[in-house]
């Protein structure tokens, strides 16, 4: 059927574009593939000489959750906050880039030695990226705006700016300004998450770890504790990565005008492993709260 449709379109001066399942067929070289089931279909297509639009659902779908599901309107499932989208490599032309993408697609560390990537001859076949929105759980225009903005700005920038020239903290500063501008224009943009993300990189043979705290808000007053207590306005103010002993419990929260915003985040620094943010939530929307936005 796919080959019949492709032949019909070609006879009428048209080019077929289809989801990556079409790679199972004997396609003409003129067909274009949309890679939505991760990145592997796009990598295969580009290396086989087909034009590709990169649109991995695990990263570039706007109908996925963008913050703690219990604080958000019901969505399709999954988790794609703005930083996750911003870190995507549209042209995974090295093992390291492909592994970075695969790690956030799978929600776990993936070694560069275990992934396919786009070879030199295939890079020019990646013609763009696409963010997708499916509306099973989106009932109003305002809800649609809430799901798309400001994540659409991250997708736009990753499309025209190489990954090595993108810097999260610079983008974070700018995106907070743009959220205010969107609201001023009557667009119901998501105001960005108040959650604090804690990551830990093990040092000294597992005896210590470098801890990083991050939030989407800017400027941000993030306070933390290392003694098991909840952060309060007088707790240590985060001003950059710090080192702790393995076995330490880090608790952190965002504060605005002396009050905690959002919820407290907690991480036990395990001596056996790094703790990275791979943006994982269960893909079961029925367990999540459904609230109006």
Regions found by a protein language model. Give the residues of each.
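Hydrophobic, well-ordered secondary-structure elements that form the walls
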Residues: 9, 33, 152, 224, ...
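Active-site neighborhood of glycoside hydrolase catalytic domains
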Residues: 1-50
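Short, compositionally stereotyped local motifs that mark structural "simplifiers"
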Residues: 166-293
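Substrate-binding clefts and catalytic carboxylate motifs of secreted carbohydrate-active enzymes
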Residues: 72-207, 216-220
């Amino acid at each position: 059927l796919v080959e019949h449709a492709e032949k019909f379109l070609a006879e009428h001066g048209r080019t077929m574009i289809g989801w990556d399942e079409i790679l199972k067929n004997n396609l003409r070289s003129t067909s274009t593939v949309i890679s939505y089931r991760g990145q592997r279909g796009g990598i295969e297509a580009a290396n086989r000489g087909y034009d590709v639009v990169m649109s991995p659902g695990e990263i570039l779908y706007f109908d996925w959750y963008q913050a703690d599901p219990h604080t958000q309107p019901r969505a399709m499932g999954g988790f794609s906050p703005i930083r996750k989208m911003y870190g995507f490599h549209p042209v995974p032309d090295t093992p390291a880039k492909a592994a970075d993408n695969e790690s956030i697609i799978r929600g776990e560390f993936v070694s560069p030695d275990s992934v396919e990537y786009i070879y030199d001859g295939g890079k020019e076949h990646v013609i763009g990226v696409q963010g997708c929105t499916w509306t099973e759980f989106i009932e109003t225009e305002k809800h649609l705006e809430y799901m798309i903005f400001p994540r659409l700005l991250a997708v736009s920038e990753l499309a025209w700016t190489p990954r090595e020239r993108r810097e999260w903290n610079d983008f974070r500063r700018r995106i907070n300004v743009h959220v205010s501008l969107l609201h001023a224009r009557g667009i119901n943009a998501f105001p960005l998450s108040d959650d604090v993300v804690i990551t830990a990189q093990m040092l000294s043979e597992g005896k210590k770890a470098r801890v990083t705290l991050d939030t989407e808000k800017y400027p941000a007053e993030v306070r933390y504790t290392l003694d098991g207590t909840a952060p309060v306005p007088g707790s240590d103010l985060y001003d950059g990565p710090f080192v702790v002993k393995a076995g330490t419990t880090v608790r952190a929260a965002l504060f605005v005008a002396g009050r905690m915003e959002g919820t407290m985040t907690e991480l036990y620094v395990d001596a056996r492993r790094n703790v990275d943010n791979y943006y994982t939530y269960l893909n079961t929307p029925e367990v999540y709260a459904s609230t109006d936005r």
